[in-house]
Amino acid sequence: MITVRAPATSANLGSGFDVFGVALDRPADVIRVERAERTTIEITGAGSQYIPTDPNSNTVGAVVDALDAPAHIEIDKGVRPSSGLGSSAASAAGAAVALNELYDRGLSRAELVPIAAEGEAVVSGTAHADNVAPSILGGFTIATADRVEHVDTEIP
């Protein structure tokens, strides 16, 4: 079993709204994955009763499909849904990192960003990296439609 922590994020930063993103220290989702014949999702924690566990309706289902990595996935929600802190992005980002490791796909963190962004399309209708990029890469990121940059800077 692989366990990862995926931090909350903010991508609502002034003139960089939905472009600039920053990872936060707290809260965070904890995602545990183990290989399985078919994908199942179990969710506990903040607002879990409002989140679908059907892989076709959950952000992590798209990540599983993109990585061809069926698994039993446990998500302990620390990032409350509809809080404006990238709840769905944290789950998708954490699943991408954990499944990449579990299945030894060898993808870099940067290569996982567009995969996790596909998970965002499940809940928002559009694949976007504004929240998944900082959740995966940490720190401050700039995400446009065709590019993501990680900015190495101290965040106060």
State the predicted function of each range.
Residues 36-38, 69-72, 99-115, 149:
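Phosphate-handling active-site elements
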Residues 10, 53-61, 89, 93, ...:
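Electropositive phosphate-/nucleotide-binding environments in soluble metabolic enzymes
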Residues 109-156:
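ATP-dependent small-molecule kinase catalytic core of the GHMP/sugar-kinase superfamily
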Residues 1-83:
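ATP-binding N-lobe of GHMP and related small-molecule kinases
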Residues 7-12, 16-23, 82-92, 122-139:
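FAD-binding core of FAD-dependent oxidoreductases
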